[in-house]
Amino acid sequence: MNHLGNVKYLVIVFLIFFDLFLVNGRDVQNNIVDEIKYSEEVCNDQVDLYLLMDCSGSIRRHNWVNHAVPLAMKLIQQLNLNDNAIHLYVNVFSNNAKEIIRLHSDASKNKEKALIIIRSLLSTNLPYGRTNLTDALLQVRKHLNDRINRENANQLVVILTDGIPDSIQDSLKESRKLSDRGVKIAVFGIGQGINVAFNRFLVGCHPSDGKCNLYADSAWENVKNVIGPFMKAVCVEVEKTASCGVWDEWSPCSVTCGKGTRSRKREILHEGCTSEIQEQCEEERCPPKWEPLDVPDEPEDDQPRPRGDNSSVQKPEENIIDNNPQEPSPNPEEGKDENPNGFDLDENPENPPNPDIPEQKPNIPEDSEKEVPSDVPKNPEDDREENFDIPKKPENKHDNQNNLPNDKSDRNIPYSPLPPKVLDNERKQSDPQSQDNNGNRHVPNSEDRETRPHGRNNENRSYNRKYNDTPKHPEREEHEKPDNNKKKGESDNKYKIAGGIAGGLALLACAGLAYKFVVPGAATPYAGEPAPFDETLGEEDKDLDEPEQFRLPEENEWN
């Protein structure tokens, strides 16, 4: 309990809780691996290798011929020299550095040519002079300054020496400059007079370090057995960084509304790379769940409403013409003796038996000429003019007199689609007095039932009566072809408009030409440059003074 009062104790407990429950529960994306660091043998990759051979007098001719040159040849045999791998540079140094194989030359990329040049050192170069390692390292730095080396290639320097350089400080300075520019330096010591501490320090190994992969030494007799493991250790030492690849597009969210997850993947290029990641996604807010509403039950009526003739009758819509009327069903109980045809002669029944059947006027047969309906108008022409909403359709010309209606009551039965025109012969039956008074009136026949345009005279009627060989099928009159007449009128109007425009343009052209020759000022645009004022005057008027030039003529000068 005393620990609870200690602030430091509480802080430590909070940090432990934060590390266990919060830090370990971080998002998965924080553990994504996008880059991999790995080690690879440099000898199989792009490398610019600089081989520096000590040719000082301390090596002696015997060791040069039997050990030093064969050591260099064995080292080159282990290298992969080609355009896309290792490029070789070789120089020998004694008093000064001498270039043997130039970097990026043919021998630098061809192992056979490089071995021929190294084998020639047995006869062309003999050990002599001092150990000028500083000049040899300076030649390597010049390649970097002149950008002779490849930018994407690893830079490796391998030194074969048997002793201590002339200037230790200068050699260390040059080695530090190369190391700062990313160049690795490896030293292979040969013989009994080598300085192990200096060589380890030259390659960057601290004296307290145990094993140094960039340094190895051997006696002259065992040099061929040591160079192989040494070069393998040097090649493995190079560390590289590789990218794990590009991610694919995100997948759609796992839900259509609310919170869900989405993921994306990529191809694994190296071991240890992350291949798939997930993250949360949120879509639009989900709508509320549908729930059925509680609908109260309606109580049924104890006494249902009666249906039948006493139910409410729906009134028919006005101004609607039935092109196919149905004949009213006859009532066998009423009017058996008065109406043998079965039609209801009651004009205004108080209670119609069937409200769905439209009101029909009685149809009087032909033999009942004495019975005249009470609703026959005195002037049938006025009645015909009121029925203007009924569309007109011509009837066949071959209708005979027997097919014509004999009763005015049939007029109200709609024909499909044009009712027959009231003729004078029907007026004769309905109103005999009017026929007697108008004795000069023309009595039409069945031929006059055809529809005619306005303005037709009686000559055409007589022609139709004279020649009865009319075609059986009715022919449409010119006024019954509105589409053809309309097209013909439109084409005639187009020609008229085009002719008017052409005539107007011709008149304008003639008026312009006339105006050009009649009015002098109209020809001004077609004239050349205006002549000077003196040139327009005559010879006798050029010497006149300005007041005399503009003086009005005297009375005697007008003639």
Curated annotation (Swiss-Prot):
Residues 1-25 form the signal peptide. One of its GO terms (biological process) is cell adhesion. Glycans are attached at residues 132, 310, 460. It is found in: Cell membrane. Disulfide bonds join 244-273, 253-281, 257-286. CDD domains: vWA_micronemal_protein (cd01471). There is a cross-link at residues 77-78 (Isoglutamyl lysine isopeptide (Gln-Lys) (interchain with K-? in Factor 3(A))). A motif (Cell attachment site) lies at residues 307-309. It comes from the Eukaryota. GO terms for cellular component: plasma membrane. Residues 431-440 have a biased composition (Polar residues). Its main location: membrane. Residues 283-292, 370-400, 444-459, 466-495, 548-559 have a biased composition (Basic and acidic residues). Keywords: Cell adhesion, Cell membrane, Disulfide bond, Glycoprotein, Heparin-binding, Isopeptide bond, Malaria, Membrane, Signal, Transmembrane, Transmembrane helix. The chain crosses the membrane at residues 497-515. This is Thrombospondin-related anonymous protein.
